[in-house]
Amino acid sequence: MYALSEKGERIRAMFGSIAPRYDLLNRLLSLGIDRRWRRFAVKKIGLNGAGRVLDVATGTGDVALEIASQTPASVSIVGIDFTPEMIELGRVKVKDSRHSGRITLEVAPCEEIPFDDGSFDAATISFGIRNVVDRIKGLTEMHRVLKGGGKIVILEFSTPTLPVFKDLYHFYFLKVLPKIGGAFSRFSAYQYLPDSVLEFPSRDVFKGMMTQVGFKDVRHFDLTGGIATVYVGTK
């Protein structure tokens, strides 16, 4: 069983504490843009026939449900997250959806995915890779469980490239967002969000990490002026 580091345990506890308000806060803080980002990311999977998709850091299951809505009924989806509180809420959401028979959710960390080599046709992780303490280990695990030719799609916050937009973005993330989030939930959780985004590697460095673990044809797509980025690679 994979043992989380002290930092990993703190991150898990933090997300567990905000789980009941997680979806609402994300909608409010992003003005709903995160839904469009998720739809764009899922389209990059490009799975048109039968298959199996893994959604890592699934949270309360939003991406797993989006995958189900965009793929044929012959596609099954497994979502994993290291936060039990998120999985518990996600299971309720999935059960109440029209895709309940296609989605299963399990508690598991990205660094130790409990499936055999070559188990999935595609893997996704949205707004989760920056929370993985050992990112190389997490990327290696996702590469391991993919079949040959399988695709990985990663959606993550980034830093805008336009100078003026970047200044506004930093002001919002560093000054406004933590206060809004703190009004609804633990302040520390929404101070962690901007800190973790600003600490995340640059696009080129992160693509290099994906290549390092074996992914090929690694590309990225900037969304909404570079506020978010989708990374795509193939095993």
Swiss-Prot record:
Catalytic activities: a 2-demethylmenaquinol + S-adenosyl-L-methionine = a menaquinol + S-adenosyl-L-homocysteine + H(+); a 2-methoxy-6-(all-trans-polyprenyl)benzene-1,4-diol + S-adenosyl-L-methionine = a 5-methoxy-2-methyl-3-(all-trans-polyprenyl)benzene-1,4-diol + S-adenosyl-L-homocysteine + H(+)
Any Gene Ontology biological process: menaquinone biosynthetic process
Binding site for S-adenosyl-L-methionine: T60, D81, S126
Position of the signal peptide: none
Xref: InterPro entries: SAM-dependent_MTases_sf, UbiE/COQ5_MeTrFase, UbiE/COQ5_MeTrFase_CS
Keywords, sorted A to Z: Menaquinone biosynthesis, Methyltransferase, S-adenosyl-L-methionine, Transferase, Ubiquinone biosynthesis
Entry function: Methyltransferase required for the conversion of demethylmenaquinol (DMKH2) to menaquinol (MKH2) and the conversion of 2-polyprenyl-6-methoxy-1,4-benzoquinol (DDMQH2) to 2-polyprenyl-3-methyl-6-methoxy-1,4-benzoquinol (DMQH2).
MF GO annotations: 2-methoxy-6-polyprenyl-1,4-benzoquinol methyltransferase activity; demethylmenaquinone methyltransferase activity
Pathway where this protein functions: Quinol/quinone metabolism; menaquinone biosynthesis; menaquinol from 1,4-dihydroxy-2-naphthoate: step 2/2; Cofactor biosynthesis; ubiquinone biosynthesis
Protein name as it appears in the record: Ubiquinone/menaquinone biosynthesis C-methyltransferase UbiE
Organism: Geobacter sp. (strain M21)
PROSITE patterns: SAM_MT_UBIE, UBIE_1
Superkingdom, natural source: Bacteria
Family: Belongs to the class I-like SAM-binding methyltransferase superfamily. MenG/UbiE family.
NCBIfam families named among the record's database cross-references: MenG_MenH_UbiE, PRK00216.1-5
EC number: 2.1.1.163, 2.1.1.201
